[in-house]
């Protein structure tokens, strides 16, 4: 039992998105837990979305995993004891490493893992396994924004300012972000600003916009270049800011100079007049923010698209100016902390580069090993999944906190690769679609049953507090990592199971890094301090560092203190419509579901609100395909077919259809999505794939999920 598990109520945070809304949980057993939003937490201020209100329901999911499962020779998963399950995993790992080398064992983590879990997972992979083959599902979420922000500012923090700054803004531009559905409590901070929304869909957020720009999917880069062109051509740039705080403007302008508004209109469909109006609104605002979301980022050129929006923000003098700025809306619950703590293919804790000799030496010293023993960078997430079971790819995969059988692009291929493994191990709270394929399934705790820390979208480190003991034989992921590490010959003390002890090591590992947590302690967090990283440990006689809620006010994180314009130019999406596939499909989230749906599809209230896959389509487009509202449709791309219920929407672009990606089985949107990768980040092109629609004969009609 933990130090807090005997309490009947705890202050903690929602288990879903990166807002990490403050909540208060009460109850003595899983079946009677209640949740209330906390008015004292500034991000949600007493607000909570439908998912947050229903989160306790998942604690008693009918198929909650309560015991380890192992697959018998006959093919069935059957209950087993922890020792037997971990022994089987360790035995297989040793065999595979002996026969194929350490990189034959891979690890895939998740952006919902606590900082402590993400940190220990990276250490486990690189030391206990000795593998370079580790990445996480944040590669499908924040990779583009992270790369662009690091290149421009020298460091990546989703929002380099508190969420509450948005409420005092005059104008906020949202590029590819439908926060009214994906982060509803954030909308209370967007009531005052005039909103500019860039989205091909007439989303719930776009409905509240003062100005809605609707580019064809895959053309954001041309639009952002055009907005920069307008700013320069109409004399709306902040020339003093550009001269005093940035470098590289001339090279960026060289590309934008060729994207005058009328040319942009031809490529994107956005009227030149609206382009000019958007720039006027931003430039005339006393305070303004530009924010990107997955709609701008999940492309084979996602990093360049975010860079183009950053260039616009820099030209207008927004980043590093109090009350204004640029930011990216982190999606997953710990998408920020998850990419800082070492579970990403090319990073070490503290947001250190795995190829930096000084960074390697620092982490090696903390871990008590030689820097030469640390593997180099491995494959990015999709490349890793695509290589599973191949001649030169991993033969074993350990999965914590994600469901790639549903969430990865070209999922038929991914499922085939998972099936080709010698060993698939999945730690989860429910039998997700990936867990159902596993050789060993390990039941782990969820948010109300564990301690730890989470870092939200504004870089604020938060305490997750335990209300209940785990049910059945469920254990923390930290116990899983310790159990496997010790069976592979590592000292038990090197893999603590107490989150507080892991955090103390994490503090030392992050010291001096870009994401410096060394001055943050559980004691300070429990005392109610609001601590945003970087928060370095002070010298012996200095007071505690207060944290850094606003970055870049004095300088940017590059050695010369200047932000960088990045020269980028538009290029088409990886595929464009043709006679066989005349439409563009784009994917995204809906209000009642979350990520792969493994959690929310098990909550009756949420499942009732969004029970099956659908394809949102203009009535004229549907009619040309022989479809009526409510008909079951085949959505066919060059990679495969998904089934979805036709949903008329007169506001849709006639050339574009939309599918949510939360559903499993034949309704998986990722059966059709394109795994074309951004060369800078490994981000797949989730937002653009060419398709055609076909009706499903009545004799074959049924639920698409």
Model-inferred region functions:
Residues 1-234, 244, 248, 252, ...:
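N-terminal export/assembly segments and adjacent metallocofactor-ligating motifs
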Residues 76-78, 234-272, 349-364, 369-372, ...:
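N-terminal leader/propeptide and maturation segments of large enzyme subunits in energy/redox metabolism
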Residues 101-104, 237-242, 289, 320-327, ...:
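Flexible, glycine/charged-enriched surface loops at secondary-structure junctions
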Residues 106-113, 266-270, 293-300, 332, ...:
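Conserved short loop/turn motifs at secondary-structure junctions
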Residues 119-191, 195-198, 205-207, 221-225, ...:
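Extended redox/cofactor-interaction regions of prokaryotic respiratory oxidoreductases
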Residues 163, 448-470, 481, 485-487:
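Glycine/threonine-rich phosphate-binding loop and adjacent beta-strand/alpha-helix elements that clamp
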Residues 208-209, 259-261, 291-296, 461-469:
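Flexible glycine/proline-enriched surface loops and loop-helix/loop-strand junctions
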Residues 470-531, 596, 600-616, 620-705:
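Long, contiguous, secondary-structure-rich segments that constitute the structural scaffold
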């Amino acid at each position: 039992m933990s130090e807090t598990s005997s309490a009947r109520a705890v202050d903690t945070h929602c288990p879903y998105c990166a807002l990490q809304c403050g909540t208060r949980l009460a109850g003595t057993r899983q079946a009677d837990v209640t949740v209330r939003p906390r008015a004292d937490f500034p991000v949600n201020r007493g607000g909570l979305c439908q998912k947050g209100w229903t989160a306790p329901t998942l604690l008693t999911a009918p198929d909650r995993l309560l015991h380890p499962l192992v697959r018998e020779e006959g093919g069935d998963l059957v209950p087993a004891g922890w020792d037997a399950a971990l022994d089987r995993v360790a035995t297989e790992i040793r065999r595979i490493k002996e026969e194929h080398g350490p990189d034959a064992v891979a690890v895939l983590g998740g952006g919902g893992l606590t900082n402590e879990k993400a940190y220990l997972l990276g250490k486990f992979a690189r030391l206990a396994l000795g593998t370079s083959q580790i990445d996480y599902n944040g590669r499908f979420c924040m990779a583009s924004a992270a790369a662009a922000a690091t290149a421009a500012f020298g460091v990546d923090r989703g929002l380099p300012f508190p969420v509450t700054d948005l409420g005092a803004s005059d104008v906020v531009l949202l590029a590819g972000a439908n926060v009214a559905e994906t982060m509803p409590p954030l909308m209370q901070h967007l009531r005052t600003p005039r909103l500019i929304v860039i989205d091909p869909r007439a989303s719930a957020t776009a409905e509240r916009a003062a100005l809605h720009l609707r580019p064809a999917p895959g053309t954001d880069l041309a639009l952002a270049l055009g907005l920069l062109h307008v700013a320069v051509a109409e004399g709306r740039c902040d020339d003093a800011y550009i001269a005093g705080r940035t470098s590289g403007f001339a090279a960026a302008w060289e590309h934008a100079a060729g994207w005058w508004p009328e040319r942009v209109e031809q490529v994107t469909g956005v009227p030149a007049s609206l382009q000019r109006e958007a720039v006027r609104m931003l430039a005339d605002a006393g305070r303004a923010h530009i924010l990107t979301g997955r709609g701008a980022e999940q492309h084979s050129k996602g990093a360049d698209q975010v860079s183009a929006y950053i260039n616009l923000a820099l030209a207008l003098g927004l980043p590093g100016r109090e009350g204004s700025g640029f930011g990216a809306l982190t999606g997953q619950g710990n998408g920020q902390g998850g990419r800082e703590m070492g579970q990403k293919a090319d990073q070490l804790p503290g947001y250190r580069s795995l190829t930096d000799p000084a960074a390697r030496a620092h982490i090696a010293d903390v871990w008590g090993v030689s820097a030469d023993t640390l593997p180099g960078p491995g494959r990015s997430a999709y490349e890793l999944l695509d290589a599973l079971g191949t001649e030169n790819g991993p033969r074993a995969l350990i999965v914590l906190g994600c469901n790639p059988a549903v969430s990865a692009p070209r999922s038929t291929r991914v499922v085939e690769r998972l099936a080709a493994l010698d060993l698939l191990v999945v730690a989860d709270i429910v039998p997700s679609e990936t867990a159902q394929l596993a050789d060993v399934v390990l039941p782990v705790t969820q948010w109300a049953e564990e301690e730890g820390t989470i870092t939200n979208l504004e870089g604020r480190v938060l305490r997750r507090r335990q209300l209940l003991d785990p049910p059945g034989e469920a254990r923390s992921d930290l116990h899983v990592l310790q159990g496997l590490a010790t069976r592979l010959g590592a000292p038990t003390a090197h893999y603590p199971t107490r989150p507080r002890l892991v955090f103390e090591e994490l503090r030392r590992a992050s010291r001096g890094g870009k994401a410096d947590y060394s001055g943050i302690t559980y004691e300070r967090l429990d005392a109610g301090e609001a601590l945003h990283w970087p928060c370095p440990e002070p010298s012996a006689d200095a007071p505690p560092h207060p944290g850094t809620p606003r970055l870049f006010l004095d300088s940017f994180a590059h050695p010369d203190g200047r932000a960088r314009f990045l020269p980028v130019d538009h290029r088409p999406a990886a595929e464009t419509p043709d006679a066989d596939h005349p439409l563009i499909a784009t994917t995204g989230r809906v209000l009642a579901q979350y990520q792969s749906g493994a959690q929310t599809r098990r909550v009756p209230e949420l499942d009732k609100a969004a029970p099956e896959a659908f394809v949102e389509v203009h009535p004229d487009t549907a009619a040309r395909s022989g479809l009526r509202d409510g008909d079951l449709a085949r959505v066919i791309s060059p990679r495969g077919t998904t089934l979805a219920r036709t949903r008329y929407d007169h506001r849709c672009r006639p050339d574009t259809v939309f599918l949510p990606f939360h559903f499993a089985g034949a309704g998986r949107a990722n059966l059709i999505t394109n795994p074309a990768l951004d060369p800078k980040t490994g981000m797949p092109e989730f937002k653009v794939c060419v398709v055609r629609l076909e009706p499903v004969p009545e004799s074959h009609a049924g639920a698409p999920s």
